[in-house]
Regions:
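Non-catalytic tandem-repeat scaffold regions and their flanking low-complexity/translocation tails
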Residues: 1-213
Length: 213
């Protein structure tokens, strides 16, 4: 059975075009911070009023902040961040990227940092390229960072492999450099095969997270 927060998020999304004020009210009333953050972002993405959109984005980031744990704050905030990318607001986008990257940097776990940055980078696929690469550099660092006791970060390397077709589409030379640094030959070969099989990849379809659908 679908939970009430999930149902209310879907209802708010559906109402955003036909009754944006009611959609905003419904999204605001969701008690769960995670679902409220997403619902407000979905309303912001679909509504036609610039004023209402700006309000919903601000409240969405606030709901994300209220989650407390660094990785949950950042992952949830990737939803309103993606709305900023898709609907304009370049100056605010830069401010929010700077804020979120600073928050991520406080997490000592490279695994959690990589998981958070994966969503941030997904939100920034349509952003100005310099912002994308700024987030990517932190993702790459987290994915390559050794785990406790110096263990190889296999999970991080596997995440980088997922991003290789997008990197290759944006900057083939940078993708090659990233491939060369992957320690595992099996993962590196998988990445090369994925790139070869998807020469004209659509970055947004390849990495759909966070989803605004």
């Amino acid at each position: 059975m679908t939970s009430k927060p999930t149902q209310d998020r879907h209802r708010a999304k559906r109402l955003a075009l036909s009754d944006p004020d009611e959609a905003l009210r419904l999204a605001r009333d969701i008690e769960d911070h995670w679902f409220r953050c997403q619902a407000l972002a979905l309303v912001a993405f679909r509504c036609e009023s610039d004023t209402l959109r700006a309000t919903a984005i601000t409240e969405s980031f606030q709901a994300g902040w209220e989650l407390g744990a660094v990785n949950r704050v950042v992952v949830a905030s990737s939803w309103p961040l993606k709305v900023l990318c898709k609907k304009g607001g370049a100056e605010r986008l830069e401010d929010e990227v700077r804020r979120l990257l600073a928050i991520i940097d406080t997490d000592r776990s490279p695994v959690r940092r990589a998981e958070s940055l994966d969503f941030v980078l997904g939100a920034l696929i349509t952003a100005p390229r310099e912002l994308f690469w700024q987030a990517y550099e932190q993702l790459e660092e987290a994915c390559r960072a050794p785990l406790h006791g110096g263990k190889r970060n296999v999970k991080g390397e596997a995440l980088l492999v997922q991003w290789m077709p997008v990197l290759h589409a944006f900057d083939p030379a940078r993708a090659e450099a990233a491939l060369a640094a992957i320690q595992g030959p099996v993962l590196a070969e998988r990445a090369r095969a994925t790139i070869a099989q998807n020469p004209s990849v659509n970055p947004e379809k390849w990495i759909p997270r966070p989803s605004l659908d």
